[in-house]
Amino acid sequence: MVEEKKYRVESDLLGELKVPAEALYGVQTQRGINNYHISRKTMVDNPDFIIAIAFVKLAAIETNHSLGVINDEISGAIAQACREIIEGKWHENFPIDMVQGGAGTSVNMNANEVIANRALEIMGHEKGDYQYCSPNDHCNCGQSTNDVYPTSIRLALIRMNTHLVGALTGLISAFRYKADEYSDAIKMGRTQLQDAVPMSFGQEFNAYANNLEEEILNLERNVKLLHEINMGGTAIGTGLNAVPGFAKLCAANLSKLTGENFETATDLVEATPDTGAYVSYSSALKRLAVKLSKICNDLRLMASGPRCGLNEINLPPKAPGSSIMPGKVNPVIPEVTNQVCFKVIGNDTTISFAAEAGQLELNVMEPIITESLFESLTWMKNAIETLTSECILGITVNKERCYEMVKNSIGIVTALNPIIGYKKSTKVAKEAHETGRSVYDIVIEQGIMSKEELDKALDPNEMLQSHKLTLK
């Protein structure tokens, strides 16, 4: 008796299976739970994905109702169930592992079963009484995993991209703030880790901000590719079992529901196995990761020391740095951001291999593409938010040390090139390097320039921008 209350029995092609009595999912979801213990990350860990598939199912039921395929009562109950999921309800009923075989069939059926069973409850029936509302005949009407799954992925990625861009915008603002705060702080620019010419921290931090703004534009360019969908193509793009007009009306309904501009692919047979949009978007994430990792490398290098490194900036101390070396504090926030960037770059390689592995009319490797993209987006967003709040906003600059390094640098001799010529400047630089004396003292001692001329030429602030030049 207790056993009967804890479980209900459902059946499918492979036979009967016990399902928890209170679960909104059914037999095919239970098989997915039993089969896949891979990533230990489920749909529950990706609420944007659950919401996305509910939007797709809502657009589909509205389309089928408008075309006279499903009656008012069933379509109304299914639509209500979808809206509840979109509002955040019933998400615990999506326990399927994100990495799975079957090209996402377990995910699609998980959604179909949850929606069907919730619709049954709304209509006053028992869960599992599928004669009144079927996961396949009603919730999946005119659809296939092969159009529902990729469309849901695309919508989820669009939603997650918005979160990522928001985090990036915050990081850019933080760099702009620091650029303003230290606009007058002079430092030595370096190329190949050798002294180059002076610059300001305002220029350095603004360059980081501008660099990242380019990445927002690149992400937005690539996310547009995700707005082409194959809903209505059903199994392989031929539209079998979808009524005429379903594809375009479903895209229009999905656009209206989400506020996004979705369009039906021109060739649904071509679109069904195509993963090019995922590859392009992942490439944009990789490009962001490469640039962000470089910025973190710079921050760690500029903060090196405190006595025997550059010690140009101070990063906020976040944790004791060693179990054996007293007083050591490490740049842990840039370090963790670096590691996230490595992960995103690696995920891009996984996505490339999975995209290449498609065969004929379908790419069955979409689950690993999906999980890799979701992981990259989630990790990157979290890392950027952490970098912003726990590191960038707390950066301070060691102005006096930076100025002393500029003043004593051999690199400032570059500013004398237009005045005394490259050859003479090279001799001054060589002597300064060999003797340890300053460029300033050597030029004055040898009478190459007057003190007044030299003071003006070697004013660090004058070296931060271009000037009118007349060669003698």
Protein language model annotation of sequence segments:
Residues 1-472:
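Conserved, well-structured ligand/cofactor-binding cores
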